[in-house]
Design a protein with these regions (language model features):
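TPR alpha-solenoid repeat register
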Residues: 55, 87-89, 122, 130, ...
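TPR/TPR-like (Sel1-like) alpha-helical repeat modules
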Residues: 80-84, 96, 107-115, 149-156, ...
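N-terminal leader/linker segments that initiate helical-solenoid repeat arrays
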Residues: 4-57, 65-68, 74, 263
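Alpha-helical adaptor scaffolds
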Residues: 136-197
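Flexible helix-coil transition and linker loops at the boundaries of alpha-helical arrays
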Residues: 9-13, 43-47, 77-82, 113-127, ...
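Terminal, low-structured helical/coil segments at or just beyond the last alpha-helical repeat
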Residues: 9-16, 166, 223-265
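Structural motif corresponding to the intra-repeat A-B loop/turn of tetratricopeptide repeats
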Residues: 32, 66, 98-99, 141, ...
């Protein structure tokens, strides 16, 4: 996967340093991301214009994807120093997704939120509204009231202002799991029903539905949901990411264990 970027309009610059760096930066698109040639082009752009933030960001990305977080951070921090907006948002999302650095991610994303004047933005891969990322960070730190605050901003406010089509494909699922963790089972089931209406082809939806129904002593219904989860997982319809385990992702072993646990009850 290559996170897409648009070509920069080099005409917005007036000095020759930025214009030359911009042209070289755009030319790097002729080569596959992370190849020696591509990296050399970004390095050349930086040498010509050391304050060209976009080149610092792009040269960092292959290191992130390869797991060289030290080198990624060295370059990414330079991009953030030069352009806090938008790169605080990018760095915060990456700290959450790749490093599970929940506190660090929240620090970046709160600063980004202020700089953006509290206008929600999406994660670098387009999967999440950054308020959902902030909610998941708070959840993993055990800060449930704060998590629900950000879920409300990322779901309820977006729904009211922009409509259902702007709600992420996984948002209701993650909020449902969070509600399950605090034993709010009826509301968790309601969010899963919303998730099913939004997009119903993930095994995780029915796995968590099954767990909640089991916790409510509705074991027959729980088994029905878990069997559906197993069928979807067997058909490869489950959460997945080529770089990291996703939040609330489940595996066939999890589903089988849940089914066995109920049958042995």
């Amino acid at each position: 996967m290559q996170w897409c970027r648009s070509q920069t309009n080099c005409r917005v610059f007036t000095d020759s340093c930025h214009i030359k760096a911009c042209l070289i930066y755009n030319a790097a698109d002729s080569f596959h991301q992370g190849t020696r040639k591509s990296q050399q082009y970004y390095d050349s752009a930086i040498r010509i214009c050391p304050d060209y933030a976009e080149a610092w960001h792009e040269i960092s990305v292959p290191y992130l994807k390869r797991g060289d977080f030290f080198t990624w951070r060295k370059y990414m921090d330079r991009a953030v120093a030069l352009k806090p907006y938008p790169y605080l948002g990018t760095r915060g999302w990456c700290r959450w997704k790749f490093l599970r650095d929940y506190e660090g991610a929240l620090t970046d994303l709160r600063r980004f939120d202020t700089l953006s004047q509290f206008h929600p933005s999406n994660s670098g891969d387009g999967t999440y509204n950054l308020y959902i990322v902030m909610a998941l960070c708070e959840r993993e730190l055990g800060h449930y009231p704060q998590a629900f605050h950000y879920f409300s901003l990322g779901i309820d406010s977006v729904l009211a202002q922009q409509g259902d089509k702007w709600i992420g494909f996984l948002d209701y699922l993650h909020r449902a799991v969070t509600k399950m963790r605090i034993s709010d089972y009826p509301e968790a089931l309601r969010d899963l029903e919303r998730q099913i209406k939004k997009y119903d082809n993930f095994a995780e939806i029915y796995y968590y539905q099954g767990l909640i129904l089991h916790l409510m002593n509705l074991d027959k219904d729980a088994l029905t949901s878990l069997e559906k989860a197993k069928s979807l997982a067997a058909a490869n319809h489950h959460l997945s990411d080529i770089y990291c385990e996703m939040p609330d992702e489940v595996f066939m072993e999890d589903i089988d264990e849940a089914i066995d646990r109920i049958k042995k009850k």
